[in-house]
Amino acid sequence: MTQSIKKELLFKTAEGNPVYKFRIPNNTGDYVDVTNCGASISGIYVHRPDMSMEDLAGANTLPILGGSLGKVLSDTVWSVMEEGENHVLFAQELNGADSPFGVSVKVGLRITWVNLNRLIVDIFATPAEAAAVNIEGNISIDSSGKAFGICTFCPSLTDSSGNETAVAESAYKGMAFAPLYCETPIFLNHSEEIKPMIELADDKSLLRLSVYSTFDSASCSKDEAASRVNIKAFSSGEEQLKKGQTLTHGIILGIDYIHTPAEDDGVEPTPLSCLF
């Protein structure tokens, strides 16, 4: 990294808690803006193929944490625990009365922005007592002027009745892109490792959004009124944790603009071409 995070104090709450905006750059001049108010992304600024800048987050600042924890913490000012070279780490603690799990829980959220325009989100939850815990991550994208199609790398999905069925027997078979309407099925891959889940594509802008996750479930919904596409990664069920045990999950959003054949004409191949 040759650039560093820029930190700006936006305001202080009535209780005196500081609300910051962090601008995290990478070496290509693309950057993300995040804030500790709700642990939210307020901007994803990337260069289009013509080198103009686009904000994929749009006008709204939306929390990353979803599910039952997100409902409780979406308006909370999180503590800033760490400011790294290309990441920030936020933390919050809920007492048993406020926790959706019935016990006190410590929650952490780390946002990292790296070269090649990869946004990495890590979510942590540690209960003070044994409890069944579930966490969820959300990333929201401005869809103005775009018509996204979606394909999945997952082997199965849940149908409208909640039954698990093979992707090979659905409209998404063969990694075919299907139009993104209101809401997709839930795509399932029960492998515990980080793996590709879904990909979104807009042919007009040549934009590709790839979602990798350690969660076993992913879905996508389209909000026409707000001109947004909401990507959700989550666990299909609760995970039973012991006292002090930490549940960790991660999401990677890859942002790419594909090149047309015309753009590739005249480009001399190099020994490294196979890597791109």
What is the role of each PLM region?
Residues 2-276:
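An exposed, glycine/acidic-rich loop-and-rim segment of catalytic or binding clefts
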